Amino acid sequence: MSITEPARQIPLYGEYDVVVLGGGPAGILAAASAARNGARVLLVERYGFLGGMGTAAGVSNFCGLHANIHGDIRQVVHGMTDELLDRMRALDGLNDPHLILGKIHAQAYDISAFKC
């Protein structure tokens, strides 16, 4: 089964090297990283704010950024993640890491700070 559509002209609104779909944590950092490396980037987000499901649905924890190393909870994911966390911390929107279910290290944040 197939559908045939007539040919049509579609306007282009720009030319980009990288198009990132979704303005969640991964999308934000992917777009920023590509732009810093000289790419022309378009970040497409369906909501009127960034943050992905964290801000849209109230999932307000980053999981996987920290690990238990010799009894200490330490951040193990760095790079541009540090910049994101620093910006949220400057807005007083970041809490200390904590345990969920006794084994998952998570870092809670203020959803409003992620939208900025």
Please place each PLM-identified region on the residue numbering.
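Short gly/ser/thr-rich secondary-structure transition/capping motifs
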Residues: 1-5
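Conserved N-terminal/central alpha/beta ligand/cofactor-binding core
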Residues: 7, 13-15, 33, 39-40, ...
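N-terminal Rossmann-like FAD-binding beta1-loop-alpha1 element of flavoenzymes
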Residues: 18-42
